[in-house]
Amino acid sequence: MRISTANTFDNTVSTLMSRQLQLQKSQTQLTSGKRISQASDDPTGAAQAERSRAEISRIDADNRALQASQNAMTLSESGLGDATDILQQIRETLVQAGDGSYTDTERKALATKIQDLRSQLFTIANRTDGAGNYLFSGQGSGGPPFVDQNGGAKYVGVAGTNQTGVFNGYPLSIDGRLAFEQANSGNGSFVTDAGTNVNTGDAPQAWVDTGSLIDPKALTGHGYTIQINGTAPAQNYVVTDDSSGNVVASDAYSSGHAIQFDGMSMSISGSPVDGDQFTVQPSTADLHVFDVLDRAVAHLTTPARSGAQVSQANATDLRDIDAVMRNMQNVRSQVGETMNNLDNTQTRMSALKLNAQTEKSNAEDLDMVQGISDFQSQQTGYQAALQTYAMVQRMSLLQFITS
């Protein structure tokens, strides 16, 4: 077969250009560190890299939302901690107020202190995140969630929580009702209180304590009335179920001794008179922090109270303060649990992002060791081809004959 010189030249030039293009491509890959610079380089790999980039973008957006939630929950947890500290100060003040030697003037001074602490607590309830968003507004953020009216503080936020996030809903606020308005009244199971004297209509001359639950299974959820009958020292008590009218317990009365019935235990202290009544009602989840403080102030500013009235009011106020503090601490614990969940979610998101970045790198990044090796091999081949071509070009039939 006869091959013309022109044909040989064309084939050689084509081979050289192909090797040069391969060399340029390898050089571009080494410079960028990318195996794929355009989709045509590897359509399958390019598609995988694009999916990974989209995943990373979604994770980054969700992470920004999560960080906003972490900031809001941190501030909320701090606010609930501050609120609990203030309630503890109020409790200590009420313990002072229970001193039987205090005068009306001294108790009024304690009431003023409680009012000042109440104002601080109200400010915390309307605290923002620094960007104008109210921490305890629930789903509403257009204005302060709590307003002070003539009838006391009122929650005007929206039930629930604001949420953000792409993959999950991350809370940006706390439902202020849960923290400030939904404590369980009494001891959490039932509520004791002084009634009136069935004969005179006056307040009892004794007081009832908070009581305790001794058998949860025996609770009926009914209301009860405890009545003292007779005159000291031959007095007795009778406990009547308000629902049925049946007597469920009765015995001789002794100051400070336990009165037990239907899974509950409590004691009445002091010197009651014939006809004094006390009430027991089921606990309800509607105890408002600010209502508790307002009642405590009202009690402390009421003059000329009897010793029994002071003791009963003080026992009630301390019981209610303890109840709202327990509730505040429970909500704070829930926020702390949310913060832990957010931290765990952030850890998982970091792992997902790392996985997406790895997949993206595997799809489009260049193996530098292999890339350098390929480049050197292509460079050597290209140089050899150039040298061979140059040598062939210098050869001719005349040179062959004369050599």
Where are these regions (language model features)?
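Amphipathic alpha-helical polymerization modules
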Residues: 1-149, 294-403
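Cysteine-poor, low-complexity segments in flexible/peripheral regions
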Residues: 144-306
